[in-house]
Regions:
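Cofactor-binding loop segments of dinucleotide-utilizing enzymes, especially the Rossmann-like FAD-
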Residues: 29, 50, 132
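Intrinsic, low-complexity polybasic segments
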Residues: 4-8
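Short glycine-rich, Thr/Ser-proximal phosphate-binding strand/loop in the N-terminal lobe
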Residues: 44-59, 136-142
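A short linear boundary/processing microfeature
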Residues: 42-43, 53, 119, 161
Length: 215
């Protein structure tokens, strides 16, 4: 309501709700993470693609690897964004202790699908959030997925579609590969690339979301 008792104009109300105590920076090059945040009503002030070394270290396990990379993404941009809430994430697909590659080629996609065919695997996303003037907060979210047994025709068709290129584990669950999934135990959005519930909880726990929606 305005001081005169009249309802606040819709545009003004939206403008107030869009305010935040500090800028929100997404340290990720993933269009899927940006789309998921927008789906949840969150629009980053800035999107930065961090330049880091994501090479797997000898003996590194999936959870430790994902967390290390997510933290490295924060560290790569935080010097220029100290007054911001900086969010980073890294998603890996693993069969047991083996981390499947982010598919850079059709050969990678085929390799991943053959490894996933008829088996269970885990999708891990490490979240890292650096609020202004506060310690970094982290969380790792796991979703278990089971694939049906894939025929050669299904594998060849998916490889030829090009959909798996650039995806962790060589597939996109939100696309044609959804037909390969027998069941999912855990966050579906985590398999896409960002666990929304846990991300919002991390932001809210840091004070960003609650302040953002204060009217």
């Amino acid at each position: 309501m305005t001081p005169s008792g009249r309802p606040r104009p819709l545009e003004a109300s939206r403008a107030v709700k869009a305010e935040s105590p500090a800028p929100f920076v997404l340290a990720s090059a993933s269009p899927r993470r940006l789309a998921l945040l927008r789906q949840a009503g969150l629009e980053p002030s800035v999107v930065i693609a961090p330049e880091i070394d994501e090479a797997l270290r000898k003996g590194e396990l999936p959870r430790a690897y994902a967390l290390r990379v997510a933290i490295a993404k924060i560290e790569a941009v935080i010097a220029k964004e100290r007054g911001s809430f900086v969010l980073a994430a890294d998603t890996v697909v693993a069969v047991g202790r083996r981390i499947l590659p982010k598919a850079d080629s059709e050969v990678d996609v085929e390799l991943c699908l053959r490894l996933l065919s008829g088996r269970r695997h885990v999708v891990l996303t490490a979240l890292a959030l650096k609020p202004p003037a506060k310690p970094m907060r982290t969380r790792v979210v796991a979703t278990r997925v089971a694939f049906k047994v894939l025929s050669k025709r299904e594998i060849d068709g998916y490889v030829a579609s090009g959909e798996g290129i650039g995806k962790a584990g060589g597939y996109a669950v939100q696309g044609r590969a959804e037909a390969f999934v027998r069941w999912i135990n855990g966050s579906y959005s985590n398999v896409v690339g960002l666990p929304l519930y846990e991300t919002l909880a991390l932001l809210e726990g840091s004070g960003w979301v609650s302040a953002r929606h204060r009217v």
